[in-house]
Amino acid sequence: MMAEKHGVLLVNLGTPSAATPAAVKAYLAEFLSDRRVVDLPSWQWQPLLRGLILPRRAPRVARLYQSIWTAQGSPLLYYSQRLCDGLQARLGEAIPVVLGMSYGEPSLDRALSALSDAGVTQLTVVPLYPQYSCSTSAAVFDGVAAWLARQRCIPALRFVRDYAQHPAYIAALCQRIRCSIAEHGQPDILLFSYHGIPQRYAAEGDDYPQRCLATTQAVVQALGLMPSQYAVSFQSRFGREPWLTPYTDETVVALATGGVRHLQVICPGFAADCLETLEEIAVQNREAFLAAGGHHFAYIPALNDDDMQITLLQQLVAATPA
């Protein structure tokens, strides 16, 4: 009887291959063509996307990527790969750990093929999204299922839906917050900013808002925060339909005009720092808060390649299915 071989697939959203308009256009075309992300009929959406949105949006977004690009390239890819390498070191060579991206490279197909070539018969898939959403976690499931559908022999599959309340995740977030307070002092308000989704997705059954609330409540309980000491908002809205509210960009301005002088912001939904945290929050929202009368703004970095996040992943992989 052939021995079972375990393997791990870590999945993040993805990133352009370069901070250029052409690379950003190619990445956004793939990302925004996923029906899990934008569910409009293709005949309606694709002409709008390719004829209007991408030509206008790609050059502007490329400039934003250029502002966060490092010598290592994309921060999201860099930290995701370091997470992968760190987990590989913890688990040992007998259990291959491979990184894949839903969009861009390294692709899911490439990552799954590498695990298959390594002889993996028991596969654990960990989307690096702490809070489940149909537009992120479910998109990973779709991508994995599409690859499996083309195989003659498929591995036993374990899919980690999310880890919004996992004790190791909550402990890591609390440690990040404590470090920020030690560096910057006690804020008037700690703002939890999550990536938004269209309100319609939640109305149709996506429990993402509840998962964000679960994370927030676990953290504030662990830190002993009162309701007057924190707030929750949703960022990165796209398009014209209503998204989850309150919106982060409006919230930081309202807090400043309402008398908040010291604001610290954490984005628990991002496992690795990326454009939405390093530019949208740490630059755009900081400027908006200060312009509206705020005095001190601090962005609390994502968990990135911190040992506590590697420990979290190790525990997620080791956990037995419910």
From Swiss-Prot:
Per UniProt, Fe cation binds at 195, 276
Pathway field of the UniProt record reads: Porphyrin-containing compound metabolism; protoheme biosynthesis; protoheme from protoporphyrin-IX: step 1/1
Source superkingdom: Bacteria
Q: EC number(s) on record?
A: 4.98.1.1
Query: InterPro entries under this entry?
Result: Ferrochelatase (IPR001015), Ferrochelatase_AS (IPR019772), Ferrochelatase_C (IPR033644), Ferrochelatase_N (IPR033659)
Gene Ontology cellular component list: cytoplasm
Stretches that traverse the bilayer: none
Which GO molecular function annotation, any one, does this entry have?
Answer: metal ion binding
Q: Name one GO biological process term.
A: heme biosynthetic process
Q: What is this enzyme's catalytic activity, as reactions?
A: heme b + 2 H(+) = protoporphyrin IX + Fe(2+)
Tell where it localizes.
Cytoplasm
List keywords of the entry alphabetically. Cytoplasm, Heme biosynthesis, Iron, Lyase, Metal-binding, Porphyrin biosynthesis
Pfam families for the chain: Ferrochelatase
Show the HAMAP family listed in the entry.
Answer: Ferrochelatase (MF_00323)
Function summary: Catalyzes the ferrous insertion into protoporphyrin IX.
Q: Which family does it belong to?
A: Belongs to the ferrochelatase family.
From the Swiss-Prot or TrEMBL record, give the protein name: Ferrochelatase
Q: Recite the lineage of the species.
A: Bacteria, Pseudomonadati, Pseudomonadota, Gammaproteobacteria, Enterobacterales
